[in-house]
Design a protein with these regions (language model features):
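A periodicity- and composition-biased signal for non-globular, repetitive helical segments
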Residues: 11-13, 283
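C-terminal motif of bacterial Sec signal peptides marking the signal peptidase cleavage site
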Residues: 16-19
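A sequence/structural signal for flexible, mid-protein segments enriched
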Residues: 21-356
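Short, Lys/Arg-enriched N-terminal segments with co-localized hydrophobic residues
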Residues: 1-3
């Protein structure tokens, strides 16, 4: 193991919600159709906030976004604001009237097909955790498609969490993403044009997400070992950003996510009776019409860890680097058109140039 270990300071920023929305769809039963799915959250930012409304289709297909629902967000003071449909079932709540504030409870109302669906009020937590990401280079054993064990180089992140001494029980969730560049092959041309890079953002982490709670009997400091284990590849030949989203959540939201986590780690599906059903906080008057999902009020903090090529002991030839001895068709397809890669954009994310 390489002894290098780098500490990354934690700081709070308002979350860019379009990049961290999570829908938590889980192994939908192919025989269940036309069941409403409602997910979303409000955080302490100025908005907008996003709600997702969809119908299950069965046949293992993802839920189909609904365009004609009426979505309203409310706070405990009675203020309310309508949310506008954007695309594919995603609704945007501008935050002009209802704005996320710590300690305040929020809920949504969704009207669809003459049915009213209401979320139970969820209160935004006051307490935040202090989290510190640290990484080290490592060697891990993977198994090839031929069944042969292979030693490969990786970068492993630990997460050190501490919570202030305060009364009550506090609940947290962590999710991780990564962003990196992919550069297309710079084939010779008479104008000397250099193709712009693509920016890939995708989920990472050893698990779908991490959950912890703290009470007066538990330690206020915890280390999550190997929260991220990432094999080295060509994406580390340039700047590589790892992102941690920390959510302080309510007990109800924690219980919901715990069910989701259990289900994703088992062979059950979202609709297996009775233990396979995940109980969210979406309610309706008609007991024969049910919806799945959760609308939560969460405190969000985000931190970034940047890895540069000169910080790691990893070398590999860039497979997209132009080589006159290689025919055009011998390059990987993404070397000619990187936008075809999943999660790829030509524009860098807002944090790319500011995080160093």
């Amino acid at each position: 193991m390489v002894s290098m270990r780098v500490k990354i300071l934690f700081y709070s920023v308002m979350t860019f919600l379009l990049s961290c929305e999570e829908r938590y769809f889980i192994s939908l039963d192919p025989d269940v159709t036309d069941q409403l799915v409602i997910n979303g959250f409000i955080d302490q930012s100025e908005g907008p906030y996003f709600i997702y409304v969809a119908l299950t289709q069965g046949d293992w297909r993802p839920p189909l976004g609904i365009e004609n629902a009426e979505v309203v967000i409310k706070d405990e003071a009675g203020q309310e604001e309508s949310c506008a449909h954007m695309y594919e079932g995603k609704y945007s709540c501008a935050g002009d009237v209802v704005r996320g504030r710590l300690g305040v409870a929020y809920q949504i109302e969704v009207t669809y097909d003459n049915q009213l669906f209401t979320s139970s009020p969820d209160r935004m937590p006051l307490v935040e955790a202090s989290s510190l990401m640290s990484w080290t280079e490592d060697q891990i054993i993977t198994t090839s498609i031929n069944g042969v064990d292979v030693m490969e180089s990786s970068i492993n992140f630990d997460l050190d969490v501490s919570v202030p001494n305060s009364e009550g029980v506090h609940f947290f969730q962590w999710r991780f993403e990564e962003t990196y560049q992919v550069r297309e092959t710079d084939f010779p041309d008479p104008f000397g044009t250099i193709p712009p890079p693509c920016y890939i953002t995708k989920k990472t982490g050893s698990k779908q997400f991490e959950l912890l709670f703290f009470n007066e009997f538990s330690s206020r400091q915890v280390t999550l070992d190997d929260a991220i284990v990432r094999l080295f590849d060509q994406s580390f030949l340039s700047k590589h950003i790892f992102i941690m989203y920390q959510h302080a959540i309510s007990e109800s939201y924690f219980n919901y996510l715990s069910q989701v986590k259990t289900l994703t780690e088992s062979t059950g599906t979202l609709f297996d009776p009775p233990s396979g059903r995940v109980q969210g906080n979406i309610n309706t008057i008609d007991a024969t019409v049910q919806a799945i999902g959760f609308f939560g009020a969460i405190r969000v903090d985000t931190s970034y860890s940047v890895i540069y090529p000169n910080q790691i002991n990893y070398t590999q030839k860039d497979g997209c680097l132009y080589d006159p001895s290689i025919a055009d068709y011998q390059y990987e397809p993404y070397c000619a058109d990187c936008i075809k890669l999943s999660g790829s954009l030509k524009e860098p994310p807002i944090y790319w140039s500011t995080v160093n």
